[in-house]
């Protein structure tokens, strides 16, 4: 499995979310709503999730091993940093 495309939009929020990404896997499968989060130990990628009735978050889609998680994170963060080198217009979180 290879990440063949990354589409990313930065968001301007009060919280720790810095961007929302969509990735294409092997040119055939797209995963939307991947979040770039500024955590205590630096940036990381959070897979799309939804809140359960008991208030916890559960991933909707996620890699099943750390090797593939690393590939996704590396590709998304590389695009995030690449966009950081050019002037970007921020979107307000939740804007369509």
From Swiss-Prot:
Task: List, alphabetically, the Pfam families matched.
Answer: SpoVG
- Please name the taxonomic classification of the source: Bacteria, Bacillati, Bacillota, Bacilli, Bacillales
Instruction: Give the matching Gene3D superfamilies.
Output: Stage V sporulation protein G
Q: Which GO terms describe its biological process?
A: division septum assembly; sporulation resulting in formation of a cellular spore
Name of the protein in question: Putative septation protein SpoVG
Similarity comment: Belongs to the SpoVG family.
Which gene is annotated as encoding this protein in its UniProt record? spoVG
Biological role stated in the UniProt entry:
Essential for sporulation. Interferes with or is a negative regulator of the pathway leading to asymmetric septation.
UniProt keywords, alphabetically:
Cell cycle, Cell division, Septation, Sporulation
